[in-house]
Amino acid sequence: MYIKWLQIGNNHFEFKKRSVSLRNVLKSVFSKKVSAAVLTAVMLFVSVFSMSMIASAASFSPRLSAPSSSNKYYYSNLNVFYRYNYGMPNCTAYAYGRAYEILGSEPKLSWNNAEQWYGYNKANGYYKYGQTPKVGAIACWSYNGGGGHVAVVEKVENGQITFSNSAWSGKRFYLS
């Protein structure tokens, strides 16, 4: 299992390679708030790249509640996952919609399972790599036997990282 980061904005992440179990990663990552130091310690592979973002970090507005069913970024044909009947609840539909909402234009993200997002973007050379965790990143988890998971970093405050998420066949929206 490994976690990688896609960055929406001029904010970056870089962590060292660590060996961990899936159980410990999920236990740490999906707690209410995760310390940046703990998150660093539990990652096996982590990399990041940066997207150009229209909104700067100063104007970034964290999403701490579910988008309404009338929000066009999540619940319309603007969202490719919604368009092809893979909409909410679904982590990829949510993260795609959130990226669209942040950027204000269509994101250059994979239309496939979450585990393919990082490699797709890296292979196409869309984004730069960085070093410091900030808001707007898309965390990408990949593990054996599943389609992976993606979530969006909404806050990094006092060493705590807050992610917004959705889950396939699960919750439409939740924070971790």
Regions found by a protein language model. Name each.
Residues 1-35:
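Bacterial Sec-dependent N-terminal signal peptides
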Residues 30, 34-35, 39-51:
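Hydrophobic alpha-helical targeting segments used for export or membrane insertion
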Residues 58-166:
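Secreted/periplasmic proteins that engage bacterial cell-wall peptidoglycan
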